[in-house]
């Protein structure tokens, strides 16, 4: 049986994600963000609920991406996730994209010219943001030109880089329905953004989410719930540069902007510049919120849930890969566990996120 990897956030799980799972073949392994996601924000519902959503919709195995893999720019997010999936013996990586290109050929270009491409990237002026530099690199070496408004396509290119020296096939699937950030919906598909904007509309959730009962009943967390804790961190920490990736320039900008910011949106808007994108600023603020500092990615892989087929695959991996199914019995990643404690502050109805929790089992 083919073993297919999918990298996802499921924030929250919707019909487009179900479609992706239906198009994927064989045993489906999901590498999923934990309680904080790539764009630098808390997941709307916790990782256990989202893992159950995925399993009920056809996933076979759901593992958790560590915090410092989940909350990263596209290239680092993709590399970290692919490295973990490779250890679980995936043969192909399936992903949704706005533009179905020949990603295999694109990956070969990077495999052949990686050193030149990275040198070109490093030589671009710092006045450009990292996404702008990446776009310039792909345009120069592969003739690609794309818009920053197509994040799944950008991730597709990041996956092309990540698998360039690995024996993993790329399987792009045309994204269905509304765009990634779209607030509109068509007859069958709505974006995760639109769903997060309509959490108080049961009919909307029922129409566009296959496991709407889980989304409706799960405790929710948003940046507005956690913003007071971020404000406290910024006000009380004597040196913001002690946090992961925060430089002196940004530390000054963040402190100054906080004085006139009542919401996370206002703070991000004031701190962001042409060089420092809003997504990057949200990630930095997330690092400050959870107290993130540079750490090694854990060697163990935390399992959030599995089906019967997933259980059989895990049994074949025992002895080859360090699998963590119960934190407490075995330690895992201290930073991710710290981030989970902060996440729990966002809603008192949330259950303990790590200690004593066992994988969701759907047999």
Swiss-Prot record:
GO CC, alphabetical: cytoplasm
NCBIfam families associated with the record: PRK13670.1 (NF010191)
Function: Catalyzes the formation of N(4)-acetylcytidine (ac(4)C) at the wobble position of elongator tRNA(Met), using acetate and ATP as substrates. First activates an acetate ion to form acetyladenylate (Ac-AMP) and then transfers the acetyl group to tRNA to form ac(4)C34.
Taxonomy of the source species: Bacteria, Bacillati, Bacillota, Bacilli, Lactobacillales
Transmembrane annotation, as ranges: none
Organism of provenance: Streptococcus gordonii (strain Challis / ATCC 35105 / BCRC 15272 / CH1 / DL1 / V288)
Key words, A-Z: ATP-binding, Cytoplasm, Ligase, Nucleotide-binding, RNA-binding, tRNA processing, tRNA-binding
Protein name (database record): tRNA(Met) cytidine acetate ligase
Gene that produces this protein: tmcAL
Binding site for ATP: 7-20, 96, 152, 175
Highest taxon of source: Bacteria
Location in the cell: Cytoplasm
């Amino acid at each position: 049986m083919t073993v297919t990897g999918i990298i996802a956030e499921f924030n929250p799980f919707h019909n487009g994600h179900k479609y992706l799972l239906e198009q994927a073949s064989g045993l489906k392994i999901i590498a999923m963000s934990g309680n904080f996601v790539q764009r630098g924000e808390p997941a709307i519902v916790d990782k256990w609920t989202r893992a159950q959503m995925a399993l009920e919709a056809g996933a076979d195995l759901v593992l958790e991406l560590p915090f410092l893999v989940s909350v990263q720019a596209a290239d680092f997010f993709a590399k970290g996730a692919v490295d973990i999936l490779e250890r679980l013996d995936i043969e192909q990586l399936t992903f949704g994209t706005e533009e179905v290109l020949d990603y295999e050929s694109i990956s070969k270009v990077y495999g052949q010219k990686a050193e030149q491409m990275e040198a070109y990237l490093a030589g671009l002026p710092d006045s450009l943001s990292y996404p702008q530099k990446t776009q310039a690199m792909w345009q120069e070496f592969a003739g690609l030109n794309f818009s920053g408004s197509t994040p799944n396509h950008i991730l597709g290119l990041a996956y092309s880089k990540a698998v360039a020296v690995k024996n993993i096939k790329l399987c792009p699937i045309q994204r269905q329905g509304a765009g990634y950030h779209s607030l509109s919906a068509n007859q069958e598909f709505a974006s995760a953004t639109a769903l997060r904007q309509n959490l108080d509309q049961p009919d909307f959730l029922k129409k566009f989410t296959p496991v709407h009962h889980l989304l409706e009943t799960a405790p929710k967390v948003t940046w507005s719930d956690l913003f007071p804790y971020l404000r406290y961190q910024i006000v009380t920490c004597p040196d913001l540069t002690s946090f992961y990736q925060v430089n002196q320039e940004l530390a000054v900008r963040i402190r100054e902007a906080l004085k006139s910011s009542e919401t996370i949106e206002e703070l991000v808007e004031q701190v962001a510049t042409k060089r420092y994108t809003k997504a990057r600023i949200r990630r930095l603020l997330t690092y400050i919120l959870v107290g993130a500092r540079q750490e090694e990615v854990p060697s163990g892989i935390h399992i959030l849930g599995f089906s019967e087929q997933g259980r059989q695959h895990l049994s074949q991996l025992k002895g080859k890969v360090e699998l963590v199914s119960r934190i407490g019995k075995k330690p895992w990643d201290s930073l991710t566990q710290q981030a989970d404690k902060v996440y729990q502050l966002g809603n008192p109805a949330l259950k303990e996120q790590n200690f004593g929790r066992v994988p969701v089992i759907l047999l």
